[in-house]
């Protein structure tokens, strides 16, 4: 859609020549991708399916897709999306993640999943925020990729402290018994799924959820994230 209505870039506020996904070409170019391990997401000098980091401490999931590092301007957009009630940024961020998924089909031979599962929030935190940011991203991706968004399969049943600032050991302890499944193995037909999250740090949350999904018979778990911190 051409910019007949003086649309502006959501980051720099400059005029958009084409008002489609909210970012001008200059700001989008600042969000740089990098070669990463297709398993754990660690930065590498070239694209690879595995690396020394994930072989040393293998994550519970199988594949990872990320947009870029948690640095500006991507980090600013994520913070506004999560903490400043700017839920309408979901389309812009989901579009960037969609492009990263498409790239991963080429760089990491990624096969699209049969279903998408957003990382859940504890009900009180979601009520206070007003939305689950991962679910908003999943809804957009579900529509564009024509893949079901299963936002009621994994439940967060325990209130946990924020993960920011915790060590890897404390993160694991904080998340112990924090999630549960809302379906049984017989009720879940999907064998390849993607977990959608915002910022991936140690991966403790994703590991806990991945272990539960294995109990449902899931054979391949992909992680789709906005940024690697």
Curated annotation (Swiss-Prot):
What InterPro entries would the database entry show? Answer: ComF/GntX_DNA_util-trans, Competence_ComF, PRibTrfase_dom, PRTase-like
Q: Which Pfam families does this chain map to?
A: Pribosyltran
Please name the Gene3D superfamilies in this protein's record: 3.40.50.2020
Keyword field = Competence
Domain of life of the organism encoding this protein: Bacteria
Query: What is an annotated GO biological process for this record, any one?
Result: establishment of competence for transformation
Q: Which family does it belong to?
A: Belongs to the ComF/GntX family.
Annotated function: Involved in transformation (genetic competence for DNA uptake).
| Name this protein carries in UniProt | Competence protein F
Organism in which the protein naturally occurs: Haemophilus influenzae (strain ATCC 51907 / DSM 11121 / KW20 / Rd)
């Amino acid at each position: 859609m051409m910019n007949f209505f003086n649309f502006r870039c959501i980051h720099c506020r400059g005029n958009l020549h084409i008002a489609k996904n909210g970012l001008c070409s200059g700001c989008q170019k600042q969000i740089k991708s990098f070669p990463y391990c297709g398993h754990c997401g660690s930065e590498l000098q070239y694209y690879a399916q595995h690396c020394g980091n994930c072989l040393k401490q293998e994550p519970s999931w199988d594949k990872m897709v990320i947009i870029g590092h948690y640095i500006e301007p991507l980090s600013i957009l994520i913070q506004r999306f999560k903490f400043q009630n700017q839920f309408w940024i979901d389309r812009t961020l989901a579009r960037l993640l969609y492009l990263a998924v498409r790239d991963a089909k080429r760089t990491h031979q990624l096969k699209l999943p049969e279903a998408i599962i957003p990382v859940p929030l504890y009900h009180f935190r979601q009520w206070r925020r007003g939305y689950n940011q991962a679910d908003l991203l999943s809804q957009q991706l579900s529509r564009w990729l024509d893949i079901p968004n299963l936002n009621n399969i994994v439940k967060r049943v325990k209130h946990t402290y924020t993960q920011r600032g915790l060590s890897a050991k404390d993160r694991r302890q904080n998340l112990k018994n924090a999630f549960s499944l809302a379906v049984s193995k017989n009720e879940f037909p999907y064998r390849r799924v993607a977990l959608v999250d915002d910022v991936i740090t140690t991966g403790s949350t994703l590991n806990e959820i991945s272990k539960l999904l294995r109990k449902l018979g899931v054979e391949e778990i992909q992680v789709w994230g906005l940024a690697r911190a």
